[in-house]
A protein has these predicted regions:
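Transition-metal
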Residues: 1-82
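A short glycine-rich, His/Asp/Glu-containing loop-to-beta-strand
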Residues: 66-104
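A general structural signal for short secondary-structure junctions and capping/turn motifs
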Residues: 68-71, 137, 154-157
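Short histidine-centered beta-strand/loop micro-motifs
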Residues: 88-91, 107-113, 156
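A structural feature that tracks compact, well-ordered secondary-structure segments
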Residues: 97-100, 127-129, 155, 167
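A short hydrophobic beta-strand segment most commonly corresponding to one strand
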Residues: 100, 118-120, 145, 158-174
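A short beta-strand-loop-beta hairpin characteristic of the jelly-roll/cupin
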Residues: 103-140, 146-150
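Hydrophobic or amphipathic alpha-helical targeting/insertion segments
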Residues: 151-154, 163
Length: 174
């Protein structure tokens, strides 16, 4: 007859705890312990549905052009701020959107930022954007992308105001 050794195996919970401590020391964490929080079964959005009507916003944007100079504003933008996210300058938990106005003769100084940006030209003629020195003329309905951390500026050499919708992943990368 063979001899059976009675070795005590730690309970599963104790083994797991030891394992978690071991991987934690290596800067690792198990996804299976947090997946339910990261990818919930139902939405847990903290923003509210919202609608902005451009014909209602446009006069307010043009008034900003009268009251706030380009140098003072740097970029004259009315942010579309979600009513449930007041104070966040966000349209959703991960996106920023705003309507930017650039008047004839104005230039928004060259700048760069960690966020990627998109611009949808709403109205006006004569404006441009330049990315890394390459200038592109903006036309109604154009969709322009600016990759993150690229030097870019905007100007209006035309004789009418130009408006575009800015979209940035600002809340996501900040």
């Amino acid at each position: 007859m063979s001899e059976v050794t009675n070795t005590t195996v730690p309970p599963v919970q104790q083994q797991r705890q030891q394992y978690y401590e071991q991987i934690s020391a290596k800067g690792l964490t198990p996804l299976w312990e947090s997946l339910h929080d990261l990818v919930p079964q139902t939405p847990n959005a903290n923003c509210a549905p919202a609608l902005w009507h451009y014909p209602e916003i446009r006069p307010l944007l043009m008034r900003a052009g009268e009251l706030i100079g380009a140098r003072e504003a740097v970029r004259r933008v009315l942010v579309l701020e979600n009513p449930a996210l007041r104070g966040s300058s966000s349209i959703t938990a991960s996106l920023y959107a705003g309507l930017q106005l650039i008047m004839p003769g104005e230039v928004a100084p060259s700048h760069r930022h960690n966020q990627s940006a998109l611009r949808f030209i709403v109205e006006g003629k004569g404006a441009f954007t330049a990315v890394d020195g390459e200038r592109t003329t903006m036309h109604d309905g154009d969709f322009i992308l600016t990759p993150q951390w690229r030097w870019h500026d905007h100007g209006n050499t035309g004789n009418e105001p130009v408006v575009w919708l800015d979209g940035l992943d600002l809340p996501l990368v900040n």
